[in-house]
Amino acid sequence: MTVMKFDLIKKEGKARRGKITFPRGDIQTPAFMPVGTYGAVKSLSPVELKEMGAEIILGNTFHLWLRPGTEIIKKHGSLHGFNGWDKPILTDSGGFQVFSLGKMRKLTEEGVTFKSPVNSSKVFLSPEISMQVQRDLGSDIVMCFDECTPYPATEKEAKESMELSMRWAKRSKEAHGDNPSALFGIIQGGMYEHLRDESLAKLKEIDFDGFAIGGLSVGEPKEDMIRILDHTAHQMPEDKPRYLMGVGTPKDLVEAVYRGVDMFDCVMPSRNARNGHIFTSEGVIKIRNSKYKDDTSPLDPNCDCYTCKNFTKSYLHHLDKTKEILGSRLNTIHNLTFYQNLMKSIRKALDEGRFSEFRKEFLASYK
């Protein structure tokens, strides 16, 4: 019996306003989860994440299992005890990271054998091992182990990949056993609607606490992503959280909420921050550009983050040019605050019954 509770508070069209409740805290949805691959959101402390409004973060099963390993994390009680984040944590299963290894992996019915990117040793990961690792981490939301279907994939390749993921989903559910953490199933099927339908039907039959759409934002054209979202999102169970994995840009989030998605994660705001790409209410600023050398205005006059309240574009340009660590930190604080503020604005618009209007205005003004 899971300790997670999901309340669907309000709907506007397909867009949903909800709340996910855990013993460690509530998550207002639609929600964006900052990514802490190795247990930390790069350059930020848990206090800073809370200040910007984050209510859940994502950790990476694959990387934490390889380093530092679950024995060390278990000595701290859980990943929460290890990294000082006392709110909910979602961990992905490791499937996407294994997919990212490409030819360095060997896939069988049992699982995946690959060369460790840490020390080049031979490593085996299966649904059962992934579930045990996530249990050891004390994750609040556990993702079932799947194979992320690559893009492009023929219909035959996508079908075989999806069917393997569904067999692994069943094994994940069995291995999850009496773990009170929530277990989410992942819909696969590539760019083929009928395969997505088959996948969702199978996952409903196995019965999960939440449902995720995987295998998007893997290199496909934007129109294909929207097509699959349009087809799939609203068919996911109404009474359970819906999670779109690894997506995306601010526009992607607004468009996915419009289609019925509740939860998101993406490395984009933090990774782009380190490369000097800043999200603002009017679009992206490339702070490396010489035109900001003597610009004394803040990044975004509509933003209340620490960076915007205290520093100018000129100073941030200087930090970027001199490769100061502080530049990455200040950019990351701003970008992740921008994402959290976007989700707050979406939730407020849904609360007030004007999300459709908000979407039109946002898509028109955001370049």
Curated annotation (Swiss-Prot):
Binding site for Zn(2+): C303, C305, C308, H334
tRNA processing is among the record's keywords: yes
Cofactor requirements of the protein: Zn(2+)
EC numbers, comma separated: 2.4.2.29
Residue ranges of coiled coil: none
Quaternary structure note: Homodimer. Within each dimer, one monomer is responsible for RNA recognition and catalysis, while the other monomer binds to the replacement base PreQ1.
Annotated protein name in UniProt: Queuine tRNA-ribosyltransferase
Organism for this UniProt entry: Francisella tularensis subsp. holarctica (strain LVS)
